[in-house]
Structures are given as structure tokens and as C-alpha cells.
Amino acid sequence: MNNISNTIKKPTYSTLSNKYGFEISISNYGASLTSLKIPLPSGKKIDVVLGFDTISNYKKSFELPSAPYFGAIVGRYAGRIANGNFELDGKQHQLFQNNNKNSLHGGKEGFSQKNWVVIDSKLTENSAVTLEYISPSYEENYPGELKIQVTYSLSESNELIIEYSAISSEDTIINLTHHSYFNLDGHTGTIENQNLMIASNTILETNKENIPTGSFIDLSAHAFNFNIPKKCPNSIDNTFVLTDSNIVSASLFSPKNNLKMEVITNQPGIHIYVGGNCFGKIKGKEGANYHPLSGICFETQNYPDAPNHYNFPSAILKKGERYYHKTIYRFQLG
């Protein structure tokens, strides 16, 4: 990659494309994916992720009672941490409580409201852009200075690849994810007639505040068994347990456009989200009036509240060790 060190703190955009006409745009604000345009056989291009036309609207969206986090990188810890509290190396850490008494998606600002820095870019075949954010020690009360790099790649096989890498100056906890809302009919449509598949036999059991109890729910006779594809649910906010990183973890299919998206990840879970109450407040891209069925999130990640459950995969990143997370969104037409 060419080193194009960028210390500009104001919002900037990077655009990547491939030989088939796929095009993505990434803002350094929240390292957010702001558009993902796919050419259909008809010649029409559709944007399959929700978002806003201006960075000011992205910022305003975080003032809503339930911020949508459109397209953002979420951290230092994605999902909820009960009471905003965890123990590490025998010491209690109290995080900012921004979701009732719990901490959600990193706290008051997290990584989604930071101006990241573009440090590398490749605009030829298999184009890519790498963004970096350095989180100071005890930002949001997380221990350790954490250097995070996120690389967005657009392959010539029509894959959006997101790779996350991080290293900490002290032992810390980490759980990064990507928060795009996908709609394969185009961002102005609805997902209600799209088919969802999730390769999972269990979900995390949660309490009324959506905090994991530490137990699991078998999906054999459950409405959220999506091993065989079926219509997207009207509302869902659940973490599905993944057991095999070598298979397609989830997929979404649009009969209207004959377009399929497959999700492959090395993470132990995928949080599926449809719904929310932030809609009708701010106009979406191209004047779109978004609603709870406008999009669906595929948040590949560790389990929420893992630091407080001995039987969940460890969320601890030891001093000097490397965190690595890779997720592929593969698109197929016809």
C-alpha cells in the first residue's frame, strides 16, 4: 500500500470501486461505511446501506434517544456491558453508563463518533483503505492505550472485506464490530420480503434489559431458527452463536433484485438487529424516510457482556498482543 499519512481531523471520504462497478464510500468520521453501490443487470445502481447525506446528520443522529450508528465501527466494546462494570486483573472498572445503567457500544462516544485518520490507501485492483484511531488509556474508563486499524477492501470477486487489528499498552477488553444496516432492495425500500439465513443453533438468553444471563437458548423449535432461510423478522435484537468460521455465517437474499449477500467471519457471534425507535427524526440519504424495517444489521463480534461471564469467549486483550477480526460481505447477482 502507498503510505498517505493523513492528519486532517475534519471529515473526509474515501471511495473504492472494482471492475464490475461496485463502489463503496467510507468517511473518517466513525470509520463509517456511508454507501455501498451495486450495479444491477438492468443497468441501475442501488445503494444497499442506510445512511445520511451529510456528516452533520451523522453527528445529530447520536443525539437521538436510540442512536442508529449507521455504518460505523463500534468499540471499544460493542454491545452491552452490565452496569457498565467489569473486573480485569483483580481491579474493578466502571464505564460510562449510556444505556440505562449499562454501557453500550463503547460508552458516551465510543469509536463511532471519533475522527479516524486514513493511513494507507490502494486504489488499483482489490482496492483498500486503512483507517486508524488511537484511544488514550482510560478513555471511557477502559484501561490501556489502544491503537486500532480498520481496513476496508473491495475485491474483484465483489466482496466487501473488513479487517480489524488492535494492540494495547496494557491488558484491556475489546470487542469491535461494524454497524451497517443492509437492504438489498436499496436503502429506500423495506427488508420485509427479503430472506434471512443464520447458521446457528443457539442464541444468548437475555434479561429485560437485553443483558446476557450466561445461559443459551436452543433454536430447534424457536421462531428465530433461520438455518433454513425465511422472511426477515419485524423486530430482532439477538446474538446468535457461531461455531464454524469456515462456513457462511449468515445471508440475506432479495427476490426483487435476485441479489444475495453472504457473511463470513472469524468471530464467535453475530448480533442481528432489526427495529429501533430513531426513525422519523432525521431524513436519510436522498431524502429517504427510514423506518424500523428499512434495514438489518449483521454485527459480527464476541458476545455482549463477555467480560462478566466465565463461560463466554474471552474478551481480554493482553498487553502487546494483537487483536484480529475479519468479516467478509460477499455479494452475488443472478
Feature roles, as predicted:
Residues 1-334:
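An exposed, glycine/acidic-rich loop-and-rim segment of catalytic or binding clefts
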